[in-house]
Curated annotation (Swiss-Prot):
This is Large ribosomal subunit protein uL13. It comes from the Archaea. Part of the 50S ribosomal subunit. One of its GO terms (molecular function) is structural constituent of ribosome. HAMAP family: Ribosomal_uL13. Coiled coil: none annotated. Belongs to the universal ribosomal protein uL13 family. The keyword Ribonucleoprotein applies. GO terms for biological process: negative regulation of translation; translation.
Amino acid sequence: MRIINAEGLILGRLASKVAKMLLEGEEVVIVNAEKAIITGNREDIFAKYKQRTELRTRTNPRRGPFYPKRSDEIVRRTVRGMLPWKTDRGRKAFKRLKVYVGVPKEFEGKEFETISEAHMSRLATPKYVTVGEVAKFLGGKF
């Protein structure tokens, strides 16, 4: 089992690396999901996520598509987008992923990994928003 600390990591790069690990059969736990970052203009990011959460079908709005508002679920959904979700292999890989807001008691004191290729120090521009800020904007509880 790999425990990854998402603090200061770029969400898309983190998700692609985690998806690869899951497809290789590893169990992955992501902690501090609310501290992952999304790069780009603040207003554009908020508008994009707001539009996603408001998407519905015209015939029956209860059919979806459904996009999450909580920060841990936003990270899970991003990883899911990088897996072959419609195949059995992709669904089994997705079940091996656990995402947490903060650090749960069961993982306190354990050593966390980080993904150097996904760290925000590689950014050329300081424009970014944390996943926690996006979740708060959408009305998420965490």
